Amino acid sequence: XTSATATYAKTQDWGSCFEGKWTIKNTAACSSYPSWVAGRSYAAGDIVYYTDXGYTDLPVSRQKMCQNGMVTNC
C-alpha cells in the first residue's frame, strides 16, 4: 500500500482553454517513493501545452500525458 495522493485542479478557465495543476503528496511519515507515474487522458483533438518552471514550452498533441518523478516526505 502506498501513502500518497494525487489531485488535479483547474486553476484558470478562459472558455476555449484552461490551465490545470497536479499536486502529488506523500502522506507517509518520513518515507519516499523513488518511482511514480501520474497520467491523464484527454479527448481526441485536444492540445496540451506542457509547462516547465513557470513558462509555456512546446505544445504537446497527444491524448495521454504522463509525468515521472520522486516524492519524499523527510
From Swiss-Prot:
Briefly state the modifications made to the protein after translation: The 70 kDa chitinase is probably the precursor protein of the 30 and 20.5 kDa chitinases.
The Gene Ontology terms for molecular function here are: endochitinase activity
Query: GO:BP terms for this protein?
Result: chitin catabolic process; polysaccharide catabolic process
EC number(s) stated in the UniProt entry for this protein: 3.2.1.14
- Annotated region N-terminus of 20.5 kDa chitinase: the residues are 53-74
Keyword list, A-Z: Carbohydrate metabolism, Chitin degradation, Glycosidase, Hydrolase, Polysaccharide degradation
Region annotated N-terminus of 30 kDa chitinase sits at 28-52
Q: Where is this region: N-terminus of 70 kDa chitinase?
A: 1-27
Q: What class of enzyme is it?
A: hydrolase
**Catalytic function, reaction form:** Random endo-hydrolysis of N-acetyl-beta-D-glucosaminide (1->4)-beta-linkages in chitin and chitodextrins
Q: Which domain of life is it from?
A: Bacteria
Q: Which family does it belong to?
A: Belongs to the glycosyl hydrolase 18 family. Chitinase class II subfamily.
Q: How does it assemble?
A: Homodimer, but homotrimers and homotetramers could be observed for the 20.5 and 30 kDa chitinases.
Function, as annotated: Able to cleave chitin oligomers from N=3 to 6.
Give the protein's recorded name: Chitinases 70, 30, and 20.5 kDa
Supply the source organism for this entry: Streptomyces olivaceoviridis
Taxonomy-wise, where does this protein's organism fall, top ranks first?
Bacteria, Bacillati, Actinomycetota, Actinomycetes, Kitasatosporales
